[in-house]
């Protein structure tokens, strides 16, 4: 239940900032901050400084930021595709995220936990942190500023491209 609270409150409280401050900086900030907080949590964990309650509290804070960033990134990812392929793009992105985040990651973390070595679990934290920071940096470098723009301004529909000019499907 506490993790769900972090997941819920993050988008509710930070959501408006993604349209006022901008999606690109906010997605980058929330991803990089989540990664940094996960490293700090991992360090405390491997040193034996966390209890079940304090590690849960750390995760709630991490989920607060990560969920807000992921929610906006999901929307942004769907906006950058032309209308004609947007639904398929969303489906593929969602399926890939579910495969990695819902199936592969829990399996790998389960294997790390079974070793009963905090250092191995910490390694899993580092991999997760690296991926979050990489996502934030990727957004900074190649993200699209889509706030306060219509979907057609972000991604021109394929049907709007002129036929025969070589800039769209024939």
Predicted segments, located by residue:
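Transmembrane-helix signature of 12-pass secondary carriers
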Residues: 1-170
